[in-house]
Every structure is written in C-alpha cells, then in structure tokens.
C-alpha cells in the first residue's frame, strides 16, 4: 500500500480542477497546468479533496499511484503559490545575463552559452552570479535548472561552477608534493 498515494489532496480556495478520465486540468491565481496520466489509476474529486486510487494490485499500478498523487499535489501547489529555485555561479569571471528571451552564460569557455528561456519560467537576477528561477510547473523548473547546471557543473577542487543555493559540494584535496 502506498503511503503517499493514499493521502487525499486538499484543494485550496482559488484553485479549480477539471477531470476528464485520466486528464487533470488545474487552474489557479498563478496559471494553469494540465497533465494526462497513463497507467492503472483512477482519479476522483469529492468534497474539495482529490483522491488517487490504483485500479489493479500489480507493482506498476502501486508505483504509479504514489507518483500520480505527488505530481497532482505539485501541480496544485504550483498554481496556488508557485515554485522558486535559486542557483549560484562560483568562479572568477563567471556570470550570467538575461537578454530578451535568452539566458547568456559567461563561464570561461571560448564562447558564451545562450539558453532559450521557456515561456512559463521567469528569471530574476539580483546579482550577476545569482539566478532565481520561478514557475508553476515543478518538473519544467527542475529540468531547466539542470540544463543550466550542465553547462558548468561544480568541480570538487575549487568549487567553481553552477550549483543550487544550499547544495554542498564535496571538496577534494589537491596534489601534494
């Protein structure tokens, strides 16, 4: 029995939910999200609570049960409050700028890296070495953050690179003579 899947999702005020078989549409003050689920699950709405139940007793149905419940819960939180990720850029001369709909990264390469910003993600830059990402879809936000981090992941000797705000980088000792 899924400990996550059996919990009901309470729907806060200002959030509307539309169910069409396995398609869930959620709209709120921050925007609208929709997702179609595949698998052996049933989604029902009763008294301001959303319930997810498995249709079969096999391993795949139980796995999708908890996953679907977590995804729907994140969608509800996203349209109500939104999600925020903070990235730090460490290194001499490493910085970022937003130009139009592109994020321009200067990361000690022979060229600047341009990454197109998705339409549903907002970028704020209080400093040149801090990037704050905001959006309603937690999955897309994390995916975009990983694309940015992949351009220059943090290295263990000096800690240079792009990392999440409170991410701990295990440090290694350098060469000894």
UniProtKB/Swiss-Prot annotation:
Keywords: Ribonucleoprotein, Ribosomal protein, RNA-binding, rRNA-binding. Coiled coil: none annotated. GO terms for biological process: cytoplasmic translation. The keyword Ribonucleoprotein applies. One of its GO terms (cellular component) is ribosome. Gene3D superfamilies: Ribosomal protein L6, alpha-beta domain. Pfam families: Ribosomal_L6 (PF00347). One of its GO terms (molecular function) is structural constituent of ribosome. This protein binds to the 23S rRNA, and is important in its secondary structure. It is located near the subunit interface in the base of the L7/L12 stalk, and near the tRNA binding site of the peptidyltransferase center. HAMAP family: Ribosomal_uL6_B (MF_01365_B). Part of the 50S ribosomal subunit. PANTHER family: 60S/50S RIBOSOMAL PROTEIN L6/L9, LARGE RIBOSOMAL SUBUNIT PROTEIN UL6M. Belongs to the universal ribosomal protein uL6 family. This is Large ribosomal subunit protein uL6. It comes from Rickettsia conorii (strain ATCC VR-613 / Malish 7). The lineage of its organism: Bacteria, Pseudomonadati, Pseudomonadota, Alphaproteobacteria, Rickettsiales. The gene is rplF.
């Amino acid at each position: 029995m899924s400990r996550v899947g059996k919990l009901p999702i309470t729907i806060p005020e200002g959030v509307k939910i539309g169910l069409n078989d396995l398609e869930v549409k959620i709209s709120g003050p921050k925007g609208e999200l929709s997702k179609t689920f595949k698998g052996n699950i049933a989604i029902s709405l009763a008294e301001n609570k959303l319930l997810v139940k498995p249709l079969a007793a096999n391993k795949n149905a139980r796995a999708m049960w908890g996953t679907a419940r977590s995804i729907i819960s994140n969608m509800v939180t996203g349209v109500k409050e939104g999600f925020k990720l903070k990235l730090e850029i460490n290194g001499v001369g490493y910085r970022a700028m937003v130009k139009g709909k592109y994020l321009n990264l200067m990361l000690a390469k022979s060229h600047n890296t341009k990454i197109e910003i998705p339409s549903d993600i907002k970028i704020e830059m209080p400093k040149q070495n801090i990037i704050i990402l905001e959006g309603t879809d937690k999955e897309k936000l994390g995916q975009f953050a990983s694309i940015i981090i992949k351009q220059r992941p943090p290295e263990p000797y000096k800690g240079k690179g792009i990392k999440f705000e409170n991410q701990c980088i295990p440090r290694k000792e350098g060469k000894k003579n």
